[in-house]
Amino acid sequence: MTEPARRFDVRVGSSTDGLAPVSFAERSLGAGPLQWVALAAIALAAVAADQLTKHIVSSQLALGDGVHVLGPFWIHHVRNSGIAFGFFSQATAVVIVLTGLAVAWMLVYFARSGARHPILPVALGLVIGGSTSNLLDRVRLGYVTDFLDLRWWPSFNLADSFIVVGVLILLATLVYAERDPRRPRTISDATARPS
């Protein structure tokens, strides 16, 4: 008995202009060892920087105290039981669960698509590192230490900054990928006609 014919969609527009079955193309997008090392290094550096700065602020400034740095910028020791920038401060348990789910989802996404773009380990490393650092504080302490204060925005910390920068990098990468005429396309993309 002969094996049923397999249906392969193919992708065109690669650097070799060759055709490859989708199964191979998708497999090659998964994160390899180098991507995982880069992601881990960036995430760990983000956690270390955030935890160190929180420790310095907590040990040098009493809760509620502040130090003027420059212009509208202050170092102001406050506690936050919510997510970034003080939002959802009354729902600590929900925030812990949602943060854990978000980090797990990002790791699964990276495992499947980590080689899709060279900037992904940087962007996701920042987001995962920032999220993990704040998550550790919420689980251990029930709150996070915020200290960066611009007066016109709720106080935040380095972890919040890493999350925002990582998300902005991801968005910029997505926008660039959509506008890049050299990006790989599927056969259906190449033959589609505007209606």
Give the predicted meaning of each segment:
Residues 1-195:
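Alpha-helical transmembrane bundles and membrane-interface segments of multipass inner-membrane proteins
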